[in-house]
């Protein structure tokens, strides 16, 4: 998976280009077996949450919408990646 320099403004368009590419591949389910499709979907979701943690603020984020609807608990929510060690 491609790495992004989140300090650059161009990273936002890079994210969108990557998301479009991933969605194109995911929409062609015949080309992938189930395991590869699920792995790619997982990567897409992880990248989307990483994007949101850096660029989306307020109640417009997918994480906030899922929490409001009771589909995501606080313990499931993605924490910002800046300064975090895994």
Curated annotation (Swiss-Prot):
Keyword Transcription regulation included in the entry's annotation: no
InterPro entries: C-protein
Keywords tagged on the record: Host-virus interaction
Record's keyword annotation contains Transmembrane: no
Top-level taxon: Viruses
Record Pfam families: Phage_C
GO BP, one annotated term: viral DNA genome packaging
Family: Belongs to the microviridae C protein family.
Name of the protein this chain belongs to: Protein C
Gene label: C
């Amino acid at each position: 998976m491609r790495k992004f320099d989140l300090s650059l403004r161009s990273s936002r368009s890079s994210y969108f280009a990557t998301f479009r590419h991933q969605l194109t591949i995911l929409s062609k389910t015949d080309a992938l077996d189930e395991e590869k499709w699920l792995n790619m979907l997982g990567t897409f979701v992880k990248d989307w949450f990483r994007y949101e943690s850096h660029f989306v603020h307020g109640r417009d984020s997918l994480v906030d919408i899922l929490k409001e609807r009771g589909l995501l608990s606080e313990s499931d929510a993605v924490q910002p990646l800046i300064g975090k060690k895994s």
